[in-house]
């Protein structure tokens, strides 16, 4: 199933409803931490205080920034930095230098973040608001979090998702891991924001960065039984994953 088929399908439903610094290879240490606050620095050694930990995953943790409600910081776990440096920093730096056209709808890296020793430990990003798309796919949570949504509203949300994925594809950026928790829906505007973008497969000026994560149940047959970090996604394999979540 390609883009034309997906758009035709949703347009049909919609119409029916309308009528009815350089990488440093040495291991990085943790950010300066006192009690429950963490201090990090930009490339010019300007400090910023982090507050509440909002999320924690296998690669790192996401924190709020004191005095900046619109910005979040992701700090990678020390063991991740020790294992993946300098490649990880190279990828984030490439993303910083190649912002997509729809960066305003993405938690795309804004600046590099360092510890007190000026070792790279993560990045800052815009904070996106919305409800997880997982709620919209859940029969019970859907009614709780989207009580006024009808089928036409759902179609508008999914069309927003499709259009943004297609825009990224035109820029050689593949989502890779179609986790519904990484898409946030604004119930009012019916638009989708993307978070956890640092795992995306990207290609910038001849540099290729794979997406090292994914879900087997959303992976096309030709990519099964392979390490995700060795898989090269393309628009066809992406549409396979996208089609599955559209009908969840």
Model-assigned labels for residue ranges:
Residues 32-69, 74-78, 104:
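ATP-binding glycine-rich phosphate-binding loop
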Residues 3-52, 85-88:
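Juxta-kinase regulatory segment immediately upstream of eukaryotic protein kinase catalytic domains
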Residues 179-224:
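Activation segment/activation loop of eukaryotic-type protein kinase catalytic domains
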Residues 105-157:
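Conserved structural core of kinase catalytic domains
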Residues 238:
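Conserved catalytic-loop aspartate of Hanks-type protein kinases
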Residues 77-105:
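The N-lobe alphaC helix and its flanking beta3-alphaC-beta4 segment of protein kinase-like domains
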Residues 165, 169-187:
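Catalytic-loop of the protein kinase fold
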């Amino acid at each position: 199933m390609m883009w034309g088929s997906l758009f035709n399908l949703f347009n049909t439903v919609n119409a029916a409803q309308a009528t009815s610094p350089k990488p440093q290879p040495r291991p990085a240490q943790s950010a300066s931490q006192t009690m429950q606050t963490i201090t990090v620095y930009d490339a010019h050694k300007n400090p910023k205080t982090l507050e509440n930990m909002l999320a924690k995953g296998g690669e790192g943790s996401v924190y709020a920034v004191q005095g900046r409600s619109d910005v979040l910081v992701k700090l990678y776990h020390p063991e991740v930095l020790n294992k993946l440096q300098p490649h990880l920093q190279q990828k984030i730096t490439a993303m910083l230098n190649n912002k997509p056209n729809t960066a305003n709808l993405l938690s795309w890296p804004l600046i590099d973040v360092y510890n007190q020793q000026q070792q790279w430990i993560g990045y800052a990003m815009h904070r996106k608001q919305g409800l997880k798309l997982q709620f919209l796919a859940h029969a019970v949570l859907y009614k709780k979090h989207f009580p006024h949504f009808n089928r036409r509203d759902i179609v508008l949300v999914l069309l927003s998702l499709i259009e943004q994925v297609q825009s990224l594809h035109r820029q050689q950026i593949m989502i890779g891991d179609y986790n519904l928790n990484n898409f946030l829906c604004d119930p009012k505007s019916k638009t989708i924001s993307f978070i956890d973008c640092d795992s995306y497969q990207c290609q910038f000026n001849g540099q290729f960065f794979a997406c090292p994560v994914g879900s087997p149940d959303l992976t096309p047959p030709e990519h099964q039984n392979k390490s995700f970090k060795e898989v090269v996604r393309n628009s066809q394999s992406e549409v396979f994953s996208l089609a599955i979540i559209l009908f969840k």
